[in-house]
Regions:
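Non-catalytic terminal and connector segments of soluble metabolic enzymes
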Residues: 1-136
Length: 136
C-alpha cells in the first residue's frame, strides 16, 4: 500500500464538490487515511509550494489557496496511488482535461482547478509530512 496527498482546494469546498471527489477516489478502490478541513496560511503554503515561490503566479496562488478552507487528505491504494489520483484529476487546465476526470467534469478555470495531488512518491512523502507529520 502506498499513500499520496490530495487537497480539495477552496473552490471545491465552496462549490460543495468535496463529497463527489472523495466518492470518485473510493469508487476507484482508494481509501481515505486522514482528512481535515483547514485554513491554509501563507507559511504552510510557502513550504508546500516551495518550487513556485519565485514564480510570477505565486502571489495569486497563495491568495486563492488561503481565501477559504481546503480539505487536506491522505489517500491510500495498493500501488502507484499518486499516479492513479493524478490520472483521475485530469490536466491542470480544466479545458484540456478529458471528460470523466475531476477537472474535466467540474473544473472552470486553470487558476481554480479543484484539486492538488502529489506528483511523485517522493513528493507525496514530503507533502504528507507537511500536513500530517504523525503519518510519516
Amino acid at each position: 500500500m502506498d499513500r499520496t496527498l490530495v487537497i480539495c482546494k477552496p473552490d471545491a469546498v465552496e462549490r460543495g464538490l468535496v463529497g463527489e471527489i472523495i466518492s470518485r477516489f473510493e469508487n476507484k478502490g482508494l481509501s481515505l487515511v486522514a482528512a481535515e478541513l483547514r485554513s491554509l496560511d501563507e507559511e504552510t503554503l510557502s513550504v508546500h509550494y516551495v518550487e513556485h515561490v519565485e514564480k510570477p503566479f505565486y502571489g495569486d496562488l497563495v491568495a486563492f489557496m488561503s481565501r477559504s478552507p481546503a480539505m487536506v487528505m491522505v489517500v491510500e491504494g495498493p500501488e502507484d496511488t499518486y499516479a492513479v489520483v493524478r490520472s483521475m484529476m485530469g490536466a491542470t487546465n480544466p479545458r484540456e482535461s478529458a471528460l470523466g476526470t475531476i477537472r474535466g467534469d467540474y473544473g472552470l478555470i486553470v487558476t481554480e482547478n479543484l484539486v492538488h495531488g502529489s506528483d511523485s512518491l517522493e513528493a507525496a512523502e514530503r507533502e504528507i509530512g507537511i500536513f500530517f507529520p504523525n503519518l510519516i
